[in-house]
Structures are given as C-alpha cells and as structure tokens.
A protein has these predicted regions:
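Conserved structured core elements
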Residues: 10, 27, 31-38, 55-69, ...
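CBM-like, beta-strand-rich accessory domains located in the C-terminal region of large
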Residues: 142-146, 151, 240-411
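Catalytic Cys-His active-site segments of thiol-dependent hydrolases/isopeptidases
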Residues: 232-237
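Long, repeat-rich segments with strong aromatic
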Residues: 34, 41-42, 47-49, 53-70, ...
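Short acidic-hydrophobic surface loop/beta-edge motif
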Residues: 18, 190-195, 222-224, 348, ...
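Active-site lining segments of carbohydrate-active enzymes
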Residues: 1-59, 164-175
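Carbohydrate-active enzyme catalytic cores, enriched for enzymes
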Residues: 23, 63-231, 285-288, 294, ...
Length: 411
C-alpha cells in the first residue's frame, strides 16, 4: 500500500504513523516512521491529476484526503512544523476540487465508485481554507459536526483537539470561484453551470480513460441536474462491494461496465476497460453563452470496421439551460447502434420523438433525432446491483448505421 496512488495510501500511512507516534517511546524509532510517511505520502498526491481532480470519486476523496490531512497534522505537530505535507503547490488544487466539482445546489457527479448524493466533507474545506489561505468565504467558519457525510474516525478525533486549522489566524475571504464552469483539463472532465442555479439545467461531462482508480467504464458519461435534482446521469455505486468486483469479473457487473452508464453501445459491444480506452478531447471551446466539449471515443469500442465515434456536448445557457448530445458514428459497413439514458426518476413518451423524465420536483424532456429519420425504439430496463434501483432507457435507431449522427436535446 505504500506504493499505491489511491486513497489507501493515505489511510494506511495515517493509521500506522499515528499508532507509531503514540506508542513507540524511542524517538529515533519514531523518526523512521515519520520519514517513511513523509516519503511515501507523495504517492497519494500522484494519484490526483495535476489539476487536482480525484479520479476515484468524491466519496474516496473524502476518505483519502481527510486521512492525508490527519497525517499532515501528525507530522507537523511531531516535528514542530519542520515537516509539512501541505508544502506542495498541488495541494491547493486538490483542496479546491471539493468546491470546483460541484454542479449546483450541493449536487455533485457520482463518477467512479461513489454513492449518489455524496457531497464534500465541509471540514476538509475549512481545514484547507485556514491552512492554505484559500479565501473561501463559505468555509471561513468551522463547520458543524457532519451528520450527512460518512464520518472518518481519525478526522473526527482530530477536531476534538487544537490543530493547525483551529489555531490559525483566519485569512481574508474573497476567492471567486468560476460560476460558469470548471474544466479539469488533465482529467478530461467539464462542469458547465447556468448563471442562475434555481430551476435551471447544469451538467457534468466526463472523458478520461477506463484505467482510473476505482474505475467505471464510463467514457462520454454525463450528468444533468435541474435545480437541485439529478434527473439523468451517472448512477455511481456500488453501495457495497461484491468480491468479484475486485477481480477480472468487475465489468461483468452492468452498473460498473459502460452498459450501466449513459454512453453508446455499438453493435452490442460495450467499452473496453483499461487506460488504452481513452476519450481524446477533440474540441473544448467555452464562452459565456455556451460550452462545446467533443470527445473521440473510438479507442473504447473494439468493433470491426469502426472508423470513428465521437460524442459532442453543447451546453447552452440561454433560457433554462440546454444540453445537446451528438454521437457521430462512421463505420465501414452498417452497425446496430444504441444510446442510453440513466435515471432514478419516472419516464414516459411525449409524442413520437420526445422522452420526458420526471423526478421529485423537476422534469426534463429529451428530443431524439436519428440519421435519415429512420425512426427509433425506446425501451427500459431496471438495474440494481449493490445499490439503489435505477432505470436504463435504451434508444435504438430502427436500422443499422454506417454513417450518421444520433442527437439528444435535453432541456
């Protein structure tokens, strides 16, 4: 675990180092543990992309980075500040991930292994805000004890005693977070927001690769939030692990494979796992009115004769917000094609070409266009694997496609 670049590095280093500093009397022996923690904790930071993005999901960010914070506090206090794991420019970017990853109204994407409804631990942002001078007015005051976020024991214990955050002099607020978007260019993830979060559509769009920590095969996945409710998108999960999820059978689970994500299926073939399956960013153009984000997904689909498959997202902020998803397929010969939507809401057809998805308080409509107006069918399937039940809505053109565009307009 000392060589791992995921949350487990920080979790184990924190536990072992904390135990050593508490129980070992010999100062020289304790120093070995401190030196090892300082050295190997670098692997934890390597697990984040250079723009601060956490590929293993927000839940594991909470778990891993909160343990990193406690480890930092242990080393800082035991060395009188001579060792500071925050002495790295990348730490500030990682800390701001918890702010920048929000879509709107406290709703975050559940990309990778993450439960729907997970939010950032406020204590992480308060601790970093105080120690790094991030200038986040929202996290200027110490947050109340969390009841809606899974507790991390070591971080909870640290709050009971003076620490570098509680003893720090509060800095001035005033950091302005880009309200319109956050583009994690190293990770290939875009958060596009409406100017007004009340009753409007904002989105999260995912590229990256299929070899990430706590990976799902989800290139081209997206999340649509209206107001404070996720209506379409990545369903996250699992809520608990089956043993086979840690083996080469991981992607036999539909909710972890691309089948359980709002991404294409070509001739019945789902996405490949592994880093070779990569969403190459073909276009990233952003203005105050609209954001255009195009991903080349060709490498993810092992389909004979597939010359190209791109997914283009256009997010328009006019009105209440509109997301246009366009899949362009180019094959040597016609292939069956399927697009999918994932939802926890109710769905129904409104006319020949429109799907309505309704949540508890909000609803969106999805207008479908297929090549040559050949017609299409819409079917649904309930999926439940170690998590809440979700609905997969499949959209299939009535004939095979060799070249053309399947378009979804969501508003």
């Amino acid at each position: 675990w000392v060589h791992r670049t995921d949350n487990w590095n920080s979790v184990c280093l924190n536990g072992v180092t904390g135990a050593a500093l508490s129980l070992i009397e010999d100062v020289h022996e304790r120093a070995y543990y401190v030196a090892a923690a300082e050295y190997y904790s670098r692997n934890s930071i390597l697990g984040f992309t250079d723009d601060g993005y956490c590929t293993e999901g927000l839940g594991y960010f909470n778990y891993g980075f909160s343990n990193y914070i406690v480890l930092r506090e242990e080393l800082y206090q035991s060395t009188g500040g001579r060792i500071d794991l925050f002495d790295d420019d990348k730490i500030g970017k990682i800390a701001l991930y918890g702010v920048n990853f929000e879509i709107q109204n406290g709703v975050y994407p559940a990309f990778a292994d993450c439960k729907i409804g997970t939010g950032v631990m406020p204590y992480i942002l308060w601790y970093c805000n105080r120690n790094l001078g991030l200038g986040l007015e929202r996290y200027a005051a110490e947050p109340a004890w969390e009841t809606d976020v899974e507790p991390v024991l070591s971080a909870t214990a640290m709050r009971c005693f003076p620490n570098t955050a509680s003893c720090a002099v509060a800095g001035s607020a005033g950091r302005k977070v880009d309200r319109l978007r956050q583009y994690f260019d190293c990770a290939g993830v875009l958060i596009s927001r409406h100017r007004n979060p009340e009753g409007t559509v904002s989105v999260a769009l995912k590229g990256g690769n299929n070899g990430e920590n706590h990976n799902h095969n989800d290139l081209g996945s997206f999340v649509v939030v209206k107001g404070g409710e996720m209506l379409i998108g990545d369903a996250g999960g699992p809520y608990n692990y089956a043993g086979d999820m840690w083996t080469d059978k991981r992607y036999t689970f539909k909710t972890l494979s691309s089948y359980g994500h709002p991404v294409p299926c070509v001739d019945g073939v789902c996405q490949l796992p592994g880093a070779e399956a990569r969403a190459r960013v073909a276009r990233a153009d952003f203005t105050e009115e609209r954001d255009v984000f195009m991903l080349d997904l060709t490498s993810a689909y092992p389909v004979d004769g597939l010359r190209g498959l791109t997914r283009s997202f256009t997010y328009d902020r006019s009105g209440g917000g509109v997301l246009i998803v366009e899949d362009s397929i180019d094959c040597e010969w016609p292939r069956a094609y399927e697009s999918a939507l994932i939802t926890f809401g109710r769905w129904s057809m409104k006319g020949r070409d429109c799907i309505e998805i309704e949540g508890k308080n909000e609803r969106v409509r999805v207008r479908v266009t297929v090549p040559g107006d050949c017609g299409f069918s819409v079917t649904s399937e309930q999926l439940q694997e170690n998590g809440p039940e979700m609905t997969r809505i499949a959209i299939r053109p009535d004939r095979k496609i060799d070249r053309g565009v399947v378009r979804l307009v969501i508003e």
